[in-house]
């Protein structure tokens, strides 16, 4: 009697498994679920077999739960692998900005859409949090460091979970090396840029980024955004270490007239005194016009830089 009942249960179980294996899933439903979730066709098919094509919501829920378990497990397994590739991002909105460095194992993953989407997700979350950050008065940028666990996406999901899901999906170790937010002093606007240029105009990404706090007293011959973009390029290319003092380096004929042998009736002479090894931003020769200092170029456009940030992938924190 016992053997017979056991045989019946085994037969019943085998029948259900066979029915599930033979259950057909339409190509359209499979494509829809794959596009909606981004998970593999194999797992999408499992979800559709389990819940049917008419219950997409539960299929999606099941996939996400399965992916979360797989992601945490894979994240733990891959956690010791070196992450020497990746991207740095900068996103700004008037007086607030966020800078995020996300690393991975290979350049192939760093160039993928999924990796850039993850970086954008973290960046926007940090920017959103920074807008509610209270600040004290001051003439410089105020910096805030965020832990990934303090951030959530638009759906309220913790960013640590989002990162683990991405690790499970992409199959590489990834690490968030920095999440920083900045608030600018009153009357200044934040602008960012990257190199090589990746991401989008609204959210630049690259191996290098720069962020500049710009104040413009009146409209110049070019827009604030264009001017800030030029200064950001200079910061990335010339690697200034400090802001420095605003000093005019050009000396006109009047400054030279007292020198012995100088003819005061001669044409005006302009002499520049710019040190090529200068590390202070405002005293550096402006990259796009080396005959002027950065300060002089800004002054010609009725603008000034209050503060700046430069970050290189894998650089110092």
From Swiss-Prot:
Paired cysteines (S-S): none
Region feature Disordered, mapped onto this chain: 248-268
Biological processes annotated in GO: mitochondrial translational elongation
Gene Ontology MF terms in the entry: translation elongation factor activity
Key words of the record: Elongation factor, Mitochondrion, Protein biosynthesis
Main location per the UniProt record: mitochondrion
Composition bias, Polar residues: 250-259
Other known facts: This protein may be expected to contain an N-terminal transit peptide but none has been predicted.
UniProt similarity note: Belongs to the EF-Ts family.
Annotated protein name in UniProt: Elongation factor Ts, mitochondrial
Organism this protein belongs to: Caenorhabditis briggsae
The organism's taxonomic lineage, starting at the top: Eukaryota, Metazoa, Ecdysozoa, Nematoda, Chromadorea
